[in-house]
């Protein structure tokens, strides 16, 4: 069964090594029959702790669709890429959002807030104070 995956890759920070490793990953994806491949460069960042004696790394997120049984073979191929420091592959779950329920919930919250505000306003009865108020009450 074809599933949608999202993978985060951490490469060495050197430009030439990064580009070469990224091309290897994309060729591996193509070899294992991945479709709808979308790649996003996140950036180069300092690592919290050294990974394989590297203090900085480049992050890349790649989304793709692939057969589930090809994934293990793809992961074994990733372990052979020299300049790839870390990777993480997740199944991307696509959920449809029911907008009617959201609209109802928002309306209920709005209605409840209006009711609370109107009750607060009704409990505040202004009582006249001062010399003008006694004149009004006497007439």
From Swiss-Prot:
Region (Disordered): 119-139
Any coiled-coil regions, as ranges: none
Keyword Isomerase: no
GO biological process: translation
Pfam family, one: Ribosomal_S6
GO CC annotations, alphabetized: ribonucleoprotein complex; ribosome
Swiss-Prot/TrEMBL keywords: Ribonucleoprotein, Ribosomal protein, RNA-binding, rRNA-binding
GO molecular function: rRNA binding; structural constituent of ribosome
Keyword Ribonucleoprotein in record: yes
Bias (Polar residues) ranges: 130-139
Function: Binds together with bS18 to 16S ribosomal RNA.
UniProt record similarity statement: Belongs to the bacterial ribosomal protein bS6 family.
Protein name, as recorded: Small ribosomal subunit protein bS6
Organism annotation: Borreliella burgdorferi (strain ZS7) (Borrelia burgdorferi)
The organism's taxonomic lineage, starting at the top: Bacteria, Pseudomonadati, Spirochaetota, Spirochaetia, Spirochaetales
Recorded name of the encoding gene: rpsF
């Amino acid at each position: 069964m074809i599933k949608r995956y999202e993978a985060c890759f951490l490469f060495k920070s050197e430009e030439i090594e990064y580009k070469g490793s990224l091309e290897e990953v994309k060729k591996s994806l193509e070899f294992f029959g991945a479709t709808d491949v979308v790649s996003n460069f996140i950036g180069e960042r300092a690592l919290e702790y050294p990974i394989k004696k590297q203090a900085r790394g480049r992050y890349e997120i790649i989304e793709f669709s692939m057969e589930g049984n090809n994934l293990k073979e793809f992961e074994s191929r990733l372990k052979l890429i020299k300049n790839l420091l870390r990777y993480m592959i997740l199944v991307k779950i696509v959920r449809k959002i029911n907008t009617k329920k959201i609209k109802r919930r928002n309306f209920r919250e709005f209605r409840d807030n209006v009711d609370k505000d109107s009750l607060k306003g009704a409990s505040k009865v202004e009582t006249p104070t001062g010399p003008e108020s006694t004149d009004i009450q006497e007439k």
